[in-house]
């Protein structure tokens, strides 16, 4: 699959995980609604589904992995930043096919697109500190 299709899958995953975090609906319902309502042309839909299910199933583990590296409590994180960091932590922890630098760079780019003004700096800082340890713990 082309890198652009994976990037689009990550962009869609941020939006869907954000919705899941706020709505409390099941990840299956969020996925179904997202795929039926959004244009997924050029999206690696298989990877999108893997990100959604992987983050949903492992959310508590992913949160525990990132917590020591946060400058504030997990509950104080913005929902967009939390979604982006969960995706990056999932890729670093469970996806050997995603190079370390790719996972971090993609998360930074997602934060630039979807996050608040300086959230990409925050995401970069968290992943710069946590990335090596998280990848080693696999």
Swiss-Prot record:
User: Which family does the UniProt entry place this protein in?
Assistant: Belongs to the NusB family.
Q: Which CDD domains match?
A: Terminator_NusB
- List the Pfam families: NusB
Function (record text): Involved in transcription antitermination. Required for transcription of ribosomal RNA (rRNA) genes. Binds specifically to the boxA antiterminator sequence of the ribosomal RNA (rrn) operons.
Q: What is the recorded name of this protein?
A: Transcription antitermination protein NusB
Q: Which cysteines are joined by disulfide bonds?
A: none
Annotated GO biological process: DNA-templated transcription termination; transcription antitermination
**Molecular function terms in GO for this entry?**
RNA binding
Instruction: Kindly give the InterPro entries that the UniProt entry links to this protein.
Output: NusB-like_sf (IPR035926), NusB_fam (IPR011605), NusB_RsmB_TIM44 (IPR006027)
Q: Name one GO cellular component term.
A: cytosol
Give the keywords, sorted. Answer: RNA-binding, Transcription, Transcription antitermination, Transcription regulation
């Amino acid at each position: 699959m082309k890198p652009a299709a994976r990037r689009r899958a990550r962009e869609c995953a941020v939006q869907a995980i954000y919705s899941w975090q706020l709505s409390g609906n099941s990840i299956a319902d969020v996925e179904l609604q997202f795929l039926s309502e959004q244009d997924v042309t050029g999206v690696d839909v298989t990877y999108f589904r893997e990100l959604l299910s992987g983050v949903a199933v492992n959310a508590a583990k992913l949160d525990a992995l990132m917590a020591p590296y946060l400058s504030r409590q997990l509950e104080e994180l913005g929902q967009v930043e939390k979604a982006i960091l969960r995706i990056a932590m999932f890729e670093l922890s469970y996806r050997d096919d995603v190079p370390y630098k790719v996972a971090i760079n993609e998360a930074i780019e997602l934060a630039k697109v979807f996050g608040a003004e300086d959230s990409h700096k925050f995401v970069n800082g968290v992943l710069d500190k946590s990335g090596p340890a998280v990848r080693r713990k696999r």
